């Protein structure tokens, strides 16, 4: 889990727009966040395997 101070800092609007960044809504991780879901790759994978994300399925070809 991310530190609460860093999560709160990311939630504030930055002075300059380019300084803003996304964080995972579930765990607060700052890297590898999918904008469509608002989740990091780890949480996205866990929730997809658990069937908590409708329309997401494991690819197979």
UniProtKB/Swiss-Prot annotation:
InterPro entries: Ribosomal_uS14 (IPR001209), Ribosomal_uS14_bact (IPR023053), Ribosomal_uS14_CS (IPR018271), Ribosomal_uS14_sf (IPR043140). Gene3D superfamilies: 30s Ribosomal Protein S14, Chain N. Keywords: Metal-binding, Ribonucleoprotein, Ribosomal protein, RNA-binding, rRNA-binding, Zinc. HAMAP family: Ribosomal_uS14_2_B (MF_01364_B). Belongs to the universal ribosomal protein uS14 family. Zinc-binding uS14 subfamily. Part of the 30S ribosomal subunit. Contacts proteins S3 and S10. This is Small ribosomal subunit protein uS14B. The gene is rpsZ.
């Amino acid at each position: 889990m991310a530190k609460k101070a860093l999560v709160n800092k990311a939630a504030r609007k930055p002075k300059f727009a380019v300084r803003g960044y996304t964080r995972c809504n579930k765990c607060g991780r700052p890297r590898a966040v999918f904008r469509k879901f608002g989740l990091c790759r780890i949480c996205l994978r866990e929730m997809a395997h658990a069937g908590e994300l409708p329309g997401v399925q494991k690819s197979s070809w």
